[in-house]
């Protein structure tokens, strides 16, 4: 456990390094501390913090920078939040009112503002699958001698359309297949369809030619309802951080943004501050050993259609207080908590 003075020194170093991207010297710490303490004491405490792996010493400078452990302690114990900027709050509210109640549009607009302010890339990921979403109807509609359409209607009113080329599959076989699908899968939750296909396959094998093509096409279409829709906003803002002048680091962060599933990354055990909503803040090696220079701040927003994840990705040296507070503000506005408190 850190002493009160050590905690203050760590807080000063983290805050100053976030602002300047420069190692923080003992002299600078002394200037920033709001307590009277000698430079020798600061050097001793800084050395102790380094020994405990809260700080790292840069070879090119006499100053120190935060380690992942130092950032984590800062986020968990030292991070403070300013009063909300009223103009920002009103701006976000106006977006909400203009866009109605469609949360995905609200988040895409709000995420652009957050990205510009934090210099982090914002990712809005909508998880389409509602836990109660079911297949309600499957219809076959012949369009011509060579083409037919299969319509899947889901319990939320959403429709999926799949075209079949009748040169590859006969209309008769397609009709038989759709009847089998309807008999076995209507009123089945979408999330369970993959598991139920094994029950359908033997029947298709014995009654339908090219059953594997029909089955593969059917599954690829219906499973689209389970896929997450991802919108990446503000990549250029993140690139303003000098950390991403390194091509290798940039390649890694782009790869994670393109391939990550925020729903898998989200972990409430990394909650940033118990006074706020559940916001997961992962730093460096907490994400992966290969991503030691990256941070992820995110939260899950529940809707009637499922969940939407708001994720911020940036370098390890970001303003965690600002990122957490902005996410918290957006969720408050979306949930209506802001109006309750007025």
UniProtKB/Swiss-Prot annotation:
Function: Negative regulator of class I heat shock genes (grpE-dnaK-dnaJ and groELS operons). Prevents heat-shock induction of these operons.
Entries under SUPFAM superfamilies matching the protein: GAF domain-like, Winged helix' DNA-binding domain
GO biological process, one term: negative regulation of DNA-templated transcription
Any GO molecular function: DNA binding
Gene it is expressed from: hrcA
PANTHER family cross-referenced by the UniProt entry: HEAT-INDUCIBLE TRANSCRIPTION REPRESSOR HRCA
Keyword terms, alphabetized: Repressor, Stress response, Transcription, Transcription regulation
Protein name (database record): Heat-inducible transcription repressor HrcA
Gene3D superfamilies linked: 3.30.450.40, Heat-inducible transcription repressor hrca homolog, domain 3, Winged helix-like DNA-binding domain superfamily/Winged helix DNA-binding domain
